[in-house]
């Protein structure tokens, strides 16, 4: 995929160098530590995961959860998410790996890039559900706590596309266009878009920096979720649904700007644009019609790590005092958060 897009932009006129301003790409995305490759793509993903876990832990505790639960759930959710993300990418871009002249084994080469967020969230949620059951925590309560951190992690992960010089848009004359350089193997001088080094800082193209658009959009969505969560006391999975809806709205228009090869449906529409619309509608409906109020966890007298045991984990109720599953549940009518909690879930403190 990377080599194909590099070949496409190589044909662009060199007059792009006359632009007054542009965003430079890194000269390389891989560094060798002896025989071990250090990949910027992986470092960005790891950094995003750390941010999501740390911020999610703080929000989870601020909402009444037990310390350490988010880290425990991440041990399950992250591997499931990586597998799901890769599986979705391969399933929707199977022509890259299967067919005449292709190498099916490369479907496992996750370090070359290629993770589909839809598969990552879906299978990651399965891993989170398993871990939440083991800890006795309702999955919607957990999801609401970690939602802003997840979308920030996605934004940080987009920096990996910047280092890899991939998934960008069409050539542009905008002053914030992204410069694309030809990368080569220093030892042979042959083109090597993925692991090579740019020996010349003359761009072969200046393109739409879709990685940057999505990064900024994701950060804005995180801010929206935090604000709405404080203002409306979102619970029962509605904060997570708001994140999903917000992300899909941005992914739709950004997807239309991208020029990398993609599976197309309904004529000439990129499949991820279609998925964005479908998921947006479902998430928006849940935000609009989902259960109001915010549940509160109450630790039981005995806490067990095994699911199904008496006293295991924590029980939840609405802030109004009713049991979550009882007939007396009444959602809180006051949308304003208590003053003491107003800043407890902020990542900057």
Annotate each predicted stretch with a short phrase.
Residues 1-349:
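A feature for loop-to-transmembrane-helix boundaries and adjacent hydrophobic helices
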């Amino acid at each position: 995929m990377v080599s194909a897009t590099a070949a496409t932009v190589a044909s662009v006129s060199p007059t792009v160098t006359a632009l007054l301003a542009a965003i430079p790409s890194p000269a390389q995305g891989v560094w060798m530590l002896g025989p071990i490759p250090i990949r910027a793509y992986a470092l960005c993903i790891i950094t995003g995961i750390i941010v999501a876990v740390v911020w999610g832990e703080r929000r989870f505790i601020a909402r009444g959860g037990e310390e350490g639960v988010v880290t425990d759930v991440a041990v399950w959710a992250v591997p499931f998410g990586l597998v799901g993300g890769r599986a979705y990418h391969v399933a929707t871009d199977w022509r890259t790996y299967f067919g005449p002249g292709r190498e099916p084994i490369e479907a496992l080469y996750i370090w070359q890039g290629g993770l589909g967020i839809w598969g990552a969230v879906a299978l990651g949620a399965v891993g989170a559900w398993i871990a939440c059951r083991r800890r006795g925590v309702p999955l919607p309560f957990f999801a609401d706590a970690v939602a802003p951190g997840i979308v920030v992690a996605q934004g940080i992960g987009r920096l990996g596309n910047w280092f890899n010089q991939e998934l960008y848009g069409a050539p542009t004359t905008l002053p914030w266009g992204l410069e694309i350089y030809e990368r080569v193997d220093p030892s042979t001088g042959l083109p090597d878009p993925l692991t090579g080094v740019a020996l010349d800082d003359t761009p072969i193209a200046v393109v739409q920096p879709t990685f940057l658009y999505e990064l900024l959009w994701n950060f804005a969505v995180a801010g929206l979720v935090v604000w709405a969560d404080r203002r409306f006391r979102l619970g029962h999975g509605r904060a997570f649904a708001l994140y999903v809806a917000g992300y899909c709205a941005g992914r739709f228009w950004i997807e239309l700007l991208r020029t990398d090869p993609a599976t197309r449906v309904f004529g000439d529409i990129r499949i991820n644009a279609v998925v964005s619309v479908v998921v947006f509608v479902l998430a928006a409906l849940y935000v609009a019609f989902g259960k109001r109020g915010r549940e509160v966890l109450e630790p039981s007298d005995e806490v067990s790590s095994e699911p199904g045991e008496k006293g295991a984990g924590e029980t939840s109720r609405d802030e109004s005092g009713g049991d979550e599953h009882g007939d007396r549940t009444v959602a809180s009518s006051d949308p304003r958060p208590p003053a003491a909690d107003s800043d407890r879930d902020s990542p900057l403190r």
